[in-house]
Amino acid sequence: MIKFILVICLFLIGCLTDRSFNTANICDIFKTNPKWKSYTEDTKNKWGVPVSLQLSFIKHESSFKRTARPPRKKVLGIIPGLRASSAYGYSQALDGTWEEYIQATGNSNADRKNFRDASDFIGWYVDGSYRLLKLSKNDVYNHYLAYHEGRGGYQKKSFNKK
């Protein structure tokens, strides 16, 4: 019985995410996760999307938690129900939008829990918004509204109703 409990404890410890960095400090983020710098630079070079925009989206959407999901709604105040959306991972990409990304880029192995893929997804999405909505790639505020509301929601200015 003790071995069983020990195995369960070790398993749970292995599932913990190490976020021992200050999410408000880009230098600390890259010092703790050096590959992330090259991933965000790759996205910048590929899509023309600033590193600061990528990181601000990821911080706001998932707080750098790779398995982030929206909270579950409560049924009768205590029973976990459905989630508000299918958002998942660093970028909090919805299932349908993630599938669009995979189709458009041919990146069939993309994973929303993978930082490189999440960064590339944000670059792809912002580039699409730049083309469709004519937003400057440095306009973080309006790009975030388009990202959060969807491009159609942005065009309808659905954010004004919130």
Task: Give the predicted meaning of each segment.
Residues 16-162:
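Catalytic glycan-binding domains that act on GlcNAc-containing polysaccharides
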Residues 1-8:
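Sec-dependent signal peptide recognition
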Residues 9-16:
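Hydrophobic h-region of N-terminal signal peptides that target proteins for export
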